[in-house]
Amino acid sequence: GPCPEGSGVADRATCATFTVPKDYDDPSSGTIELTMSKIPASGQKKGVVAGNPGGPGGDALGMFSDPSDKGEGSQAVHLPESVGKNYDLIAVEPRGLTWGTPLNCEPEIATPYMTAGMLYGACESHNPGYTKTVNTENTARDLEEARKLLGEKQLNLYGLSYGGPLMSTYATLFPEHTNKAIFDSSASPNDLVFRLAEKRQAIRHEAIHEFFSWV
């Protein structure tokens, strides 16, 4: 069907909403909704390319331009026209984002600042148990659910930036359903986001102390 308004998809793209387990380790936890976009192959279809633009948490629905537009679209990834002739291009919106069951982290009481613990508590207050499931492994498992829905035996993977570790996680979990993989400007799986944030926080802390000692 049609894609959500404002999702930035290519003109020929269509979208579908589907449900997945909220917590794959706990079937009793219920389900969440996700949205997937697809640009169908313009010629004889040979398979499917599944993409993720990185982030983590980057909006994925509109990541692919339509290869038949010869790179004229405003989307982030422009693949060769030959790819668009032979492959459907799909992207699953990562769990927790707008075009699905969103992770609502608005605090009940407005505050000028929030610690990580306060933010986590706000997220949990709206959908208990959901926050901990928004991770790389579950996002990869969500892609596997999309593959099943499409009825495809294998997926070709395209991961940009953090999408590289995400797609490599999928390939590790589901090697029998992985064909070819491209990791474009891939982030290192050793430099996890929180570790990077900790490094940046330490640098900021040092810089602030140097500034005030100078003042």
Feature roles, as predicted:
Residues 1-215:
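Gly/Pro-rich cap/lid or specificity-loop segments adjacent to the active site
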